[in-house]
Amino acid sequence: MNLSPASVYPARAHLEERRWVRQIETAATQLEVSQAAQTAAVDLFLSQRPSSDRSKPALAAACLYAGCLISGDGRSQGAVAAAMDVSRLSVQQRWKPLLEDAGFDPPGW
């Protein structure tokens, strides 16, 4: 996965956001997605870290869904939302902007 230069994050981000990284990893394991999907999801999350804790669950879920798309792991928004304990709408509203911000062209469906 090649993220755009704007999406590079400092090394300390992984430590500061370890709770959310673990949640992404746990959900990825539950969904049986590839290591590539999990890595893409964590990279997206750490590059987009919101300052508000309220935004983090939905962002983490959207990052996992986007990571699945990037790596070709077909998972539904509903399955990802359930694994991350957020609403499907939270995932639906956030995944396309995430991909665009990272320099990807999201699918048009």
Where are these predicted regions, by residue range?
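Non-catalytic, interaction-prone regions of core transcription and DNA-replication machinery
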Residues: 1-109
